UniProtKB/Swiss-Prot annotation:
Free-text function comment from the UniProt entry: An FAD assembly protein, which accelerates covalent attachment of the cofactor into other proteins. Plays an essential role in the assembly of succinate dehydrogenase (SDH, respiratory complex II), an enzyme complex that is a component of both the tricarboxylic acid cycle and the electron transport chain, and which couples the oxidation of succinate to fumarate with the reduction of ubiquinone (coenzyme Q) to ubiquinol. Required for flavinylation (covalent attachment of FAD) of the flavoprotein subunit SdhA of SDH and other flavinylated proteins as well.
Localization per Swiss-Prot or TrEMBL: Cytoplasm
Disulfide bonds: none
BP GO terms, sorted: succinate metabolic process
The organism of origin for this protein: Haemophilus influenzae (strain 86-028NP)
Phylogenetic lineage: Bacteria, Pseudomonadati, Pseudomonadota, Gammaproteobacteria, Pasteurellales
Protein name per UniProt: FAD assembly factor SdhE
Entry-linked SUPFAM superfamilies: YgfY-like
Record family assignment: Belongs to the SdhE FAD assembly factor family.
GO-annotated cellular components: cytoplasm
One family name in Pfam for this protein: Sdh5
Transcription regulation recorded as keyword: no
Keyword field: Chaperone, Cytoplasm
């Protein structure tokens, strides 16, 4: 039995903002399986955030107060080559 319900995670990757869909889903499809279990757990916690929080974090308008979540945001930005300059 798989530890992670991938259908549920994929569903949670679908967001209400196109900008987030273009960041989160491609990351999930391409990189989720490469993550350690700890990082997978953090990614799943990240998905519980609101679209407004995610937008703020991914587009450098704020930072998560949770350092693990913030590190995951920065990792995704780096891997997805997101720049907001």
């Amino acid at each position: 039995m798989e530890k992670y319900n991938k259908l549920r995670i994929e569903w949670d990757c679908r967001r209400g903002m196109l900008e987030l869909d273009k960041i989160i889903m491609p990351f999930y499809l391409k990189h989720f399986d490469e993550l350690t279990d700890d990082k997978k757990d953090i990614f799943i916690r990240l998905l519980a955030s609101t679209d407004l929080q995610l937008f703020s974090w991914f587009f450098n308008r704020g930072k998560s107060s949770d350092s693990e979540i913030q590190s995951m945001v920065e990792y995704i930005q780096n891997v997805q080559k997101i720049t907001t300059n």
